[in-house]
């Protein structure tokens, strides 16, 4: 089963947005992001989290969600990444570092005794251990915890207590991951005529594999653990098998996300392969990623983007079974911006910079709705384009986070 990553899933109608006080003179406005922040006493520590939902017209956080919860590791870990990128662009500040520490305390407290992470907490701050996307297992939220903790570590290095606990937590998590993904038999199988790797998370999940590569890279930078390199290489090889078509044949070097499905959200394969290829001097990773960036991305942008599609094999080629164009969300745009930016850093080719700018322009109105999705005066990013001309103007954590990451990526390219 493939689980959708997002903690949120709202479909509210179109409505105008009310402004709040902006952060002056900066392209990246953290006002709304910070309005979603909550500090609590959690398992004996001062911890912080970011509310999942924030709805039009007030944009006050939604403080009670019965089925799943009010916040999740998936979003808190990404909030750490936002603040780490913000520090890279604008310099370190005490408030950002304090929030990073408290977000980190939240993630550490969400580690289950089995070594993986539960995802949600309820309004009473009890941990949801049973909801399908909150069970402590090898899935998006545990991988996100890895990336969040490794991102926080160097920023908190002056605090020996918390960095020691991060190290212990990550060691336990990676022990689980390497046990459950042994990488000892890299065999493929044919599913509906399409060659698939069988050793990735959830067997075929190249999207989750990309996130794991990013986390393993950060761990390797910190620990020099050779086991990380073995796993990165196996994951990269699996991802490259999931790349289908070529420059002139559909789907134009796109990486399938899971089995025969491509989806926009969290499809960080090119981003991960470029990061790993540059860091580890693996040209095959870089070449594979550039094929998607150069061949698939421009066609997707020209077509007005998509939410997902499914492919089938026709002899040596592929054709499309079905396609959904909407909803379109910041979490579907950000991976492409990240990859195009990484491509530009590697190649110094202006075409990659132009591509990154063109994709990022989705936020400012170059989209099917014909209107901005990010409102600089408020720091709000709308939750998605529902269909041509219709926008869901709620602004939850995920949309806010992913929009800010797009903006920060573009600031780094200046």
Where do the PLM segments sit?
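Low-complexity, Ser/Thr/Pro/Gly-enriched N-terminal "stalk/linker" regions
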Residues: 9-78, 82, 90-132, 160-199, ...
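Well-ordered alpha-helical segments within folded domains of soluble proteins
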Residues: 70-88, 100, 135-154, 201-220, ...
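Non-catalytic carbohydrate-binding regions of carbohydrate-active enzymes
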Residues: 26-43, 280-392, 414
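C-terminal motif of bacterial Sec signal peptides marking the signal peptidase cleavage site
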Residues: 3-6
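Short linear capping/connector segments at secondary-structure termini
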Residues: 120-130, 188-198, 251-257, 309-319, ...
